[in-house]
């Protein structure tokens, strides 16, 4: 993280996550469920699906151009039920909420630049990978560091673990009184840039008003806190060397109660959890969201490619931390700029590193789509792929098989510098 270079030797850093039942995450998953269905039937679908939820209402809007025909309403209701909203008494349920659609086709002005990039339109290149132009202008970041085995910052990694565990114990019935909505937050104490202690763990989780015969709210909250410590937190730290201690603050439902939640408690919108989706604030963000967007949208595909580059650099031992920025112009295939920053942790010259990356990684939209197989994954995975990364983070997911998490370029990177010893930094 760039900012950490100027901080004192001892500091706290905090990241948060949310469960799949958080209103914004409900929207992300609905948008990506639609994307999965369309790409499964027509891999060339152009999709920009935005979802809004509120009490008793689901609205899907945006622009879609596809040869596929899908039952939007049925897909939406199935996803809402899968998340866990099946009780109309909670103000939002799969079978009783209104579902509204307001969908247009992709603008022809945008489409012409995506279908035929500037390089093709102006006969600047006959390379097949120069055919597809970026779906929009913008800047995207990818990041990796060696704080965890999955090469992610520790705060967001732990926040995701805890959020995912909340869902697991709810769905399994182990803590049947939990409801779908929830948020987690973890503060880590760093010394000299390395995590040394778990300072604070915060969990806000929606729950039934009563737990069995426990009706007093103070007693309900006490039970929730005890259960979460034993069943959720304890499990999440079982295989991690850095564990909570008696000095770790453990905060649960600090408002005192969390019965009303989900879309009844807060309106939700696709693309409002972009920091949760990425690196928890540990790295910079270009501002573009992922969910509901087909792979021609570089907000999504280029962010995946940038993570792929950064992770392979760190996995190859060429840096302890690495951030990759890439930027695009709409309708142009080749990136406007590419930047690699190792924040003083690099073991090789950064200019040489950039040369090696540009020679071995594909950063044109068509090349990213091809190398990471982004159009075909939904069909190859039984009709669902993007909806599964829409909650609990798009990066560092050891529970999913994600092409941008592969470290298959490590040997190529090592070989490039093994043959160029003068590139090694001193």
Swiss-Prot record:
PANTHER family: S-ADENOSYLMETHIONINE SYNTHETASE (PTHR11964). It catalyses: L-methionine + ATP + H2O = S-adenosyl-L-methionine + phosphate + diphosphate. NCBIfam families: metK. Its cofactor is Mg(2+); K(+). It is found in: Cytoplasm. GO terms for cellular component: cytosol. Catalyzes the formation of S-adenosylmethionine (AdoMet) from methionine and ATP. The overall synthetic reaction is composed of two sequential steps, AdoMet formation and the subsequent tripolyphosphate hydrolysis which occurs prior to release of AdoMet from the enzyme. Homotetramer; dimer of dimers. K(+) binds at residue 50. Its main location: cytoplasm. ATP binds at residues 22, 181-183, 257-258, 266, 272-273, 289, 293. InterPro entries: ADOMET_SYNTHASE_CS, S-AdoMet_synt_C, S-AdoMet_synt_central, S-AdoMet_synt_N, S-AdoMet_synthetase, S-AdoMet_synthetase_sfam. This is S-adenosylmethionine synthase. Its EC number is 2.5.1.6. Residues 106-116 are annotated as: Flexible loop. GO terms for biological process: one-carbon metabolic process; S-adenosylmethionine biosynthetic process. Pathway: Amino-acid biosynthesis; S-adenosyl-L-methionine biosynthesis; S-adenosyl-L-methionine from L-methionine: step 1/1. The keyword Hydrolase does not apply. GO terms for molecular function: ATP binding; magnesium ion binding; methionine adenosyltransferase activity. Binds 2 divalent ions per subunit. Binds 1 potassium ion per subunit.
